[in-house]
């Protein structure tokens, strides 16, 4: 949720953020109205309760002649308090809905606009000249790494098996990511992949894109699309100790996405699937440290991309393409030869205090006063990386070179065609 102090003191900042995102700025005025109504209702209910308490006390010391009128007054006030509390409850419900409807306020410098309005911050490496390159699925099948047909037979479209050295390649990649994280002070985690509704909502994933999330109705639990979700809930309703700097976690989990809004997109191969594995970095820090921590996450992602030896670029994602919780997001996109373009391999988001405010995660400032923490997240490795590894390291004889950093995990320097 956005900071109400900012909303009340400078609502135009929130309106401008809404416009940059392509969202309705009228939602800001609706929240201001709901906030005023809620505060008025609380004040009215408090005043009536105080008046009722005083009236009840006066009955005890009243003369017999005064008591009937005072009793009636106390009774009338009790009815008024009941009505005022009902109004307060209604206004609080309306306020919460209006508050939850507004996404995070973007940071200065974030490009305005939609999916295609990003800013390119850096380009690393030159794409190789390849004659008639094979795509990752053709390579994956010929090298015995990916089996989409049996994945579909077992679970339906957008499911797959990673087999043999394909499984080893992914496991090696994720172990490499986890090793990098641990070497940089992250605490490794294997979190739950099912979470309660309040945790999913707290991270901002039950808004406009709720239909992307798998839900187990009988248990009222959600399957996570990223381990960001359980790691954000890890310190819900807690005061965390940031006296020695940010808390950094690295979660390894399977991730699940319905891809409800992507019908017909990336139907071939493992670029867009319902289940994949990922190592995700997650950080709790003081808000003043969040932008510097965002740059650190990006640097660690770039270090991982250097390990797989692929050309990539870094983009500053436009406001309209940010999730509800992100105030800024950087993506690293790797070159995919058969598509002639760059595709996202990592993202890192600065969520400022948006998630922690919803999840009541605080820290103590230098004066010992509890304050809302900031949260950030960033991909350190995921299944989709195999796409770029295979396509960029393919060789004319149909084999694919294994990046040097992964050779020890896979057990070979070259993946050879099977049969």
UniProtKB/Swiss-Prot annotation:
Catalysed reaction, written as an equation: tRNA(Ser) + L-serine + ATP = L-seryl-tRNA(Ser) + AMP + diphosphate + H(+); tRNA(Sec) + L-serine + ATP = L-seryl-tRNA(Sec) + AMP + diphosphate + H(+)
Keywords for the protein's UniProt record, in alphabetical order: Aminoacyl-tRNA synthetase, ATP-binding, Cytoplasm, Ligase, Nucleotide-binding, Protein biosynthesis
Compartment(s): Cytoplasm
Keyword Ligase in record: yes
Region ranges (Disordered): 45-66
Enzyme Commission numbers on file: 6.1.1.11
SUPFAM superfamilies: Class II aaRS and biotin synthetases, tRNA-binding arm
Binding-site positions, ATP: 257-259, 273, 344-347
Residues that hold L-serine according to the record: 226-228, 280, 379
InterPro entries: aa-tRNA-synt_IIb, aa-tRNA-synth_II, aa-tRNA-synth_II/BPL/LPL, Ser-tRNA-ligase_type_1, Ser-tRNA-synth_1_N, SerRS_1_N_sf, tRNA-bd_arm
GO cellular component: cytoplasm
Pathway where this protein functions: Aminoacyl-tRNA biosynthesis; selenocysteinyl-tRNA(Sec) biosynthesis; L-seryl-tRNA(Sec) from L-serine and tRNA(Sec): step 1/1
Keyword Cell inner membrane set for record: no
Top EC category: ligase
Domain of life per record: Bacteria
Family (UniProt): Belongs to the class-II aminoacyl-tRNA synthetase family. Type-1 seryl-tRNA synthetase subfamily.
Quaternary context: Homodimer. The tRNA molecule binds across the dimer.
UniProt note: domains: Consists of two distinct domains, a catalytic core and a N-terminal extension that is involved in tRNA binding.
Functional description taken from the UniProt entry: Catalyzes the attachment of serine to tRNA(Ser). Is also able to aminoacylate tRNA(Sec) with serine, to form the misacylated tRNA L-seryl-tRNA(Sec), which will be further converted into selenocysteinyl-tRNA(Sec).
Name of this protein: Serine--tRNA ligase
UniProt organism field: Mycobacterium ulcerans (strain Agy99)
Gene: serS
